Amino acid sequence: GLGTGLTMAAMMGLAAVASATSVPLADVLGDWSRSLLVWTPLAALALVVWVPVARAAHRHPEREEVPEDVTHALPWASATAWLVAAYLTAQSWQFYSALAWLAPTYEAHGWTAREAGLLMAAFTGAQLLSGLAAPTLLDHVPDPRLLLVLAGLLGGAGELGVWLAPDTAPWLWAGLLGAGQGAAFALGLALLVRYAATPRDSARLTAMAFLVSYTAAAFGPAAMGVVEDVTGSFSLVWALLALVMVPQLILSLRLRPDLARVGAQID
């Protein structure tokens, strides 16, 4: 739980910094492409740090006794795997759509690009905090449904706020949206471990869940963009995202702690 939270905090923390500084950097450097180049050294540093780790892992693989009849196939026949994949699909569709369209929504309401960038920083900053807290709390809660539903309600409140009263409390809506999405995603990552019988089964579950959820969620931003093009407004976009939260909440309630683990069943 804590490891998942720290990973989320690192990702969202740097994303918040990038959101807040990219537009000012573009103003200073005179071009948005130069602003993006500023982040190249960080990517290069990550590569430099990771290469030795990958080489060491390849030279000294962990010794694990694997039964001869162990399966490496994805758990397509597992009902638990499909529940987790469906949950992550609903969450990812909303997250990537919000990531793509929150700033343009407020630019359409008269905000400058810099102001919209700061709003995105608040959105990702809230994800940092909730993404760190949620999986840590999950370690101390026997039933994940309470945290899953709470995350969904926070995110849904943010979506409803942007839809129904976008100019009333935009910073609050961005914070609620970020807190809900950050917690929901971090909890989803933790479920990939909780609902697996072994680390090897967790890898199988993760591969299947990510294949399903990211393939479906990749269409989210584009589909919401089509809605905006057709209607000429972002209002219906946020109404639809709030509607997608309904199946996420239903799936959250079905993720009981006593579900059969992937690998502990024939899948």
Language-model segments: which ranges?
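Intracellular juxtamembrane helix-capping segments at the cytosolic ends
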Residues: A183-A197
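Extracytoplasmic gate region of multi-pass secondary transporters
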Residues: A79-A122, A126-G131
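A late C-terminal transmembrane helix in Major Facilitator Superfamily
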Residues: P199-F234, L241
